[in-house]
Regions:
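Membrane-proximal intracellular helices of multi-pass ion channels
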Residues: 1-443
């Protein structure tokens, strides 16, 4: 297959796009098999396509309850799709190549670099190995901790539940097997359980800060000054985007609840929208400001080169830094004594516009197609394009047009805005001559 890509000059972005599409198609076919459902009957193509897309794109939006509709085989297929989606299709392909003893070509290395947002091609195979070891280590630790809760309650079945939820949390997928306690109930029955809350939140955060950040933490530990600027920005934004939303949920949204439930609820609700999709609270009971804040968090997402989606914390940070520079009449935005490259600013602006366009158009189309109020439709749209999985309860009742919109949004959100554009639009080399410069008034 790599020879085919090389012969027809397929770009790295196009390889990523095609790779995700092929895995989704394969997952759809497997889920359509009668053995995949508890009833032993074939599930319709549309529902299987939606579920496979949601799993590969690590979103978590579902039209069929994962616990009650799908058999063990179907759940295993979904879990494998989540793992492939979280690791990245190209990363999985590279692992298979390395395990088989074959040499990784330059084209494969370039695709791997784009897939994990690595700064350079050199050492990418070693870095990929580091990523894979880290993923399975964290997922194993998460599963072992969750077994302490699920084994006493469910018996041997608790092992499967622990493994499933650990992988789903680390990959920021949001799929759950708690439907036996109530359809689409997610983790609401564990809203005050500290072990489940802390473990799931930790897995979400670790999976969402990015693989390069892991490398910095492993290499430099507490020596923060030696971290890459990107890692510093990611960790700073992660703290900010947990602390301030948690304060809002604690002091305003959940102020009527008992103290213990407020604490865990506020923390969990600040973490899960970026971009896991588990919930321990009834989101339909939230006020409009609470739903709006959750929508914004879903759009922001996690870090680049991570299991999280969204337009990324670094995108928001770059735009804020450049806005601060403009307010102070400085030429460049900066972080930690380093200037931000002009191309980075252009990319950040492009990503913001892409996500806003997809988010707003998706919400409007769903609202018009379903004759529903705009806010819950925008919430659904943000959840899909941010690959989150939170919903205000409208997903299972949506029609064909709306489901197709969500499928496209999930796919766009997982492959990444810039990757999607680079893969679908022809690129032109910069002309040797530069056009005349002229100022234009903005603001």
């Amino acid at each position: 297959m790599w020879a085919f890509f090389h012969r027809y000059k397929i770009t790295s972005a196009q390889i990523i796009l095609v790779g995700f599409a092929l895995v989704i198609l394969l997952g759809t076919v497997l889920l359509m098999l009668p053995v995949s459902s508890r009833a032993g009957a074939a599930t319709g193509f549309a529902d299987c396509l939606f579920t496979a897309t949601s799993a590969v794109c690590v979103t978590g939006l579902v039209v069929r309850d994962t616990a009650t509709h799908w058999s063990f085989f179907g759940q295993a297929v979904i879990l494998i799709l989540i793992q492939i989606g979280g690791m990245g299709v190209i990363t999985v392909a590279a692992i298979i190549t390395m395990v088989s003893g074959k040499k990784i070509s330059l084209m494969q290395r370039s695709a791997m670099q784009d897939a994990v947002a690595a700064p350079q091609v050199g050492g990418i195979a070693r870095f990929t190995g580091f990523i894979v070891r880290g993923i399975f280590l964290f997922e194993l630790l998460g599963a072992l901790v969750l077994m302490a809760v699920f084994l006493p309650e469910y018996g041997p079945k608790g092992i499967w539940l622990a493994v499933f939820h650990s992988i789903s949390a680390f990959c920021n997928a949001g799929f759950d097997l708690m439907g036996t306690k109530g359809a689409f109930s997610s983790l609401t029955s564990y809203a005050e359980n500290p072990v489940v809350n802390l473990t799931v939140m930790a897995l979400i955060i670790i999976g969402g800060i990015g693989f390069l950040t892991w490398q910095d933490i492993r290499s430099n530990a507490a020596h923060l000054r030696q971290y890459r600027m990107q890692s510093k920005v990611i960790l700073t934004m992660t703290v900010i985007l947990i602390v301030f939303p948690a304060a809002f949920f604690f002091f305003y949204e959940l102020r009527e609840l008992p103290l213990k439930r407020r604490i865990w609820g506020a923390l969990f609700q600040a973490v899960t929208p970026r971009t896991a999709g588990f919930n321990t609270m009834d989101l339909t009971a939230f006020s409009e400001p609470g739903q709006l804040l959750t929508t914004l968090l879903m759009l922001i997402g996690g870090a680049p080169g991570s299991t999280a989606g969204g337009m990324k914390t670094t995108t928001l940070a770059v735009l804020f830094a450049c806005a601060a520079a403009a307010f102070r009449k400085r030429e460049n935005g900066a972080f930690f004594g380093r200037r931000i490259a002009d191309q980075t600013v252009k990319n950040a602006a492009a990503v913001l516009l892409l996500y806003l366009a997809m988010f707003l158009s998706g919400g409007m189309i769903i609202s018009m197609a379903e004759n529903l109020p705009l806010l819950p439709c925008l919430f659904e749209s943000a959840s899909a394009v941010g690959t989150v999985g939170l919903t205000l309860g409208i997903t299972p009742s949506l029609g064909t047009v709306s489901r197709l919109v969500l499928i496209l949004l999930m796919f766009f959100g997982r492959v990444g805005g810039m990757t999607f554009v680079f893969a679908t639009l022809p690129t032109k080399e910069n002309p040797h001559s530069r056009l005349p410069l002229e100022k234009i008034t903005v603001g």
